């Protein structure tokens, strides 16, 4: 009898202790972001200039994902601290139909991410330097939440996409996305064309 009472008391105590248990939300590591400061990308052999963060590094790239560069003006801006990079491709409108370039930009933003993105929001813009384009904000568990293209519609067409080398998770990437999104928009707003670029080395 005493054994049964002890057993019942133990079960009651165990149940009471666990009845108030609630699942705690998953936590993520706190990120210490650097202070915002910018430097100018102003290589005379490139047909564009812009400002980018001092915590980023510009690397010349011969590929834009699996697409071979058609000219030497394709670059990446790497952010080693955040395992992210901005892929930048440049195309000359004269050698490509403007409508085709715009359609390709929409295809890259929509068709390749629709199955993972919960929403895609295109935002037309005009920069302080009177250049126009569209900024794509992608919601959901995608490897990219920020894509854009910018053009003068007659000669220059530049496309950019911020990607992370990490398992796509909207909640964990949101702080870094928000931080670097400001840098992407700063790049866009400071971008200018250089009509006479010298031959690249």
Language-model features: where?
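Sec-dependent signal peptide recognition
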Residues: 2-8
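Active-site-flanking beta-strand signature of metal-NTP-handling nucleotidyl enzymes
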Residues: 9, 159-160
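Short aromatic-glycine motifs in intrinsically disordered, low-complexity regions
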Residues: 37-49, 176
């Amino acid at each position: 009898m005493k054994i049964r009472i002890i057993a019942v008391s133990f079960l009651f105590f165990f149940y009471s202790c666990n009845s108030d248990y609630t699942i705690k939300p998953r936590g993520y590591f706190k990120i210490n972001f650097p202070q915002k400061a910018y430097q100018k990308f102003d290589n005379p052999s490139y047909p564009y200039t812009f400002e980018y963060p001092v915590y980023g590094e510009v690397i010349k790239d011969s590929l834009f994902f699996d697409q071979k560069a058609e000219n030497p003006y394709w670059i990446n801006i790497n952010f080693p601290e955040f395992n992210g990079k901005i892929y930048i491709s440049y195309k000359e409108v004269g050698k490509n139909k403007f409508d085709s370039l715009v359609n390709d930009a929409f295809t890259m933003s929509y068709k390749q991410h629709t199955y993972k993105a919960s929403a895609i929001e295109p935002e037309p813009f005009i920069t302080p330097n009177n250049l126009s384009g569209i900024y794509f904000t992608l919601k959901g568990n995608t490897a990219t939440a920020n894509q854009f293209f910018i053009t003068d519609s007659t000669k220059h067409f530049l496309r950019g996409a911020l990607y992370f080398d990490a398992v796509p998770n909207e909640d964990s990437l949101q702080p870094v996305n928000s931080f670097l999104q400001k840098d992407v928009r700063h790049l866009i707003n400071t971008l200018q064309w250089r009509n006479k670029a010298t031959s690249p080395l």
